[in-house]
């Protein structure tokens, strides 16, 4: 828990420091003869963050902070295996002074989650989870070209293998 708490705090710093310059208004001079341009980034709507059971705060936190920095509100749907961690994360956002309704945490089963995925006001969907859940999201959203979908499916961590390792066991894992 201590490692994840440190990772959450570090992720906030990195996300803020790296994201703010990228989303700042940009003026581009001389884009064409006698023509200048300005790029403005605007919020697009509600972000639905479907959190994982492993690193339940760290991974969801990065997606939530990015959405908030972009001016979007967030619905956080944590894993049912990490409800307490999710509540602590929601409490941190509340303690930081975010207005009511900017971040909402909703616990639901897969049917309730799919209702949120399909809702027309939800414009960004982040899932860190399994292939089956990712396929369900794609099956329910592929016709709505206004939604941005980010799926991180079944990522694996790097393993360090020492000389005395049981290779058959290590490769199976």
Predicted regions and their residues:
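Long amphipathic alpha-helix in the N-terminal Rossmann-like dinucleotide-binding domain
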Residues: 1-24
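Conserved small-residue-rich beta-alpha loop and adjacent elements
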Residues: 28-99, 168
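A structured beta-alpha segment of the ubiquitous adenosine-cofactor-binding alpha/beta core
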Residues: 36-37, 104-123
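Periplasmic-binding protein-like
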Residues: 65, 124-128
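Residue-level signal for inorganic ion chemistry
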Residues: 71, 103, 125, 155
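ALDH superfamily catalytic-core signature
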Residues: 97, 124, 132-173
């Amino acid at each position: 828990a201590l490692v994840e708490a440190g990772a959450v705090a570090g992720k906030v710093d990195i996300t803020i420091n790296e994201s703010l310059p990228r989303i700042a208004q940009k003026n581009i001079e001389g884009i064409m003869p006698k023509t200048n341009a300005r790029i403005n980034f605007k919020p697009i709507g509600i972000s639905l963050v479907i959190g994982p059971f492993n690193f339940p705060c760290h991974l969801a936190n990065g997606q939530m902070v990015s959405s908030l920095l972009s001016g979007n509100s967030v619905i956080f749907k944590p894993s049912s295996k990490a409800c307490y961690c999710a509540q602590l994360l929601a409490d941190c956002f509340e303690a930081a002074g975010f207005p009511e309704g900017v971040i909402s945490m909703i616990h639901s089963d897969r049917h309730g989650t799919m209702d949120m995925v399909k809702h027309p006001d939800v414009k960004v969907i982040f899932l860190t989870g399994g292939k089956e859940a990712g396929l369900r999201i794609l099956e329910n959203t592929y016709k709505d070209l206004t939604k941005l979908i980010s799926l991180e499916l079944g990522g694996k961590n790097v393993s360090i293998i020492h000389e005395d390792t049981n290779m058959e066991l290590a490769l199976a894992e």
